[in-house]
Amino acid sequence: MVYLPLQSFVLCLINISQEGNSMITQELKDRLIADYPKFEDMTHKFYKKEMSIADYKGQSGAYGSYAERGANSGMSRWRFNGGRMTRQHMQFLADSIRKHNLQHVHFTTGQCLQMHGLDGDTILNLYKECYDHGIYNRGAGGDNPNVVASILRGIDPRETLDITPYATAISEFLLEQMFYIKIPRKFKMGIDNGFDSTPHATFKDLGFNLTKHNTFDVYACGGIGPNPRIGIPVAHDVQPEDVLYHVKAMLMVFANHGNFKNRGKARTRYMPAEMGGAEAFIKTYEETLAMVKEVEQLTINPADYAYEITKTGKRDNSVENDRIHRQKQEGLYYVEYHPAGGDANVEHLLSALDYAVTLDQVEARIAPDQALFFINLTADEA
């Protein structure tokens, strides 16, 4: 067991101005790039055949990159909070495709982008260029993957609460916590809006399922793969502003009770049995949650992360089809691009990006089913 004093993980909240609906501090930004030289060194060694595939994989994943079969090329994984790509991100993606001649662009189930078939220098250049454009890939391929969120959050005509502020807050919180809490293996999270189940919140390592009361039911220790498990309900009717307390509590339980000795059994879904069963796990979870609430101030102010869609259009039902659907905003629509297996046709993607960046308030979102959605379009734009 790894003992982690609660006090050593107290989050230091700094009052900073909003930047693109983000509360990431400059201190954290600096930390996300501080160990880039280590990544640079290992990548140069690997592509010079001075490091084994296994050794490289064990380290490079923390920087969102893995070697590909044959060890002559690799991939670069780009992390987007809940799959959201701003207009600036879309322009950067289009520019990068052209600059680096990217031929294999893949949409992942974790709402990330992956660029395949890259040489070492391109991987390193993309890592730095992504950072300069507010895309933080540190941890994206390691034990701290992207938080998956409902793709239609904020625009779904059925929803009663926009979960965007809470999904963003969780994503940014995890970026900071990965430097403080050592967990034995990857920790997948999902948050949904109560209608869209694609985040699979009920069978993630930790998941938040929105209820009809605009509160969250919380599930833990779920997952697919070997020993698949539906998540254990650990809390009901949690106020949205309180979700970070549950994130911190689960991270600490995983750090203290996860299996560091056997990587094959290091995921959270193995943990309850090793702790004596679901009841024993829930008891520990609740005790840890109480301690976190006593020591830390992690209540979310949704206004810090929210952004308003002010664009409107004229409703035109004739444009709706299998790929074009109506948003809850007056006269606005979203378009779905769903390539087979999530592998984009680069020419088609570039055409879409080039057009989208010319439009007001349009953004793209990568879906958990490996599609790309362009949202906030008028009927004519769609």
What are these language model-derived features?
Residues 64-70, 101-107, 256-261, 323-329, ...:
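Short, flexible, solvent-exposed loop/turn segments with mixed acidic/basic and small polar residues
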Residues 183-282:
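Mobile "lid/hinge" segments at catalytic clefts and subdomain interfaces of large enzymes
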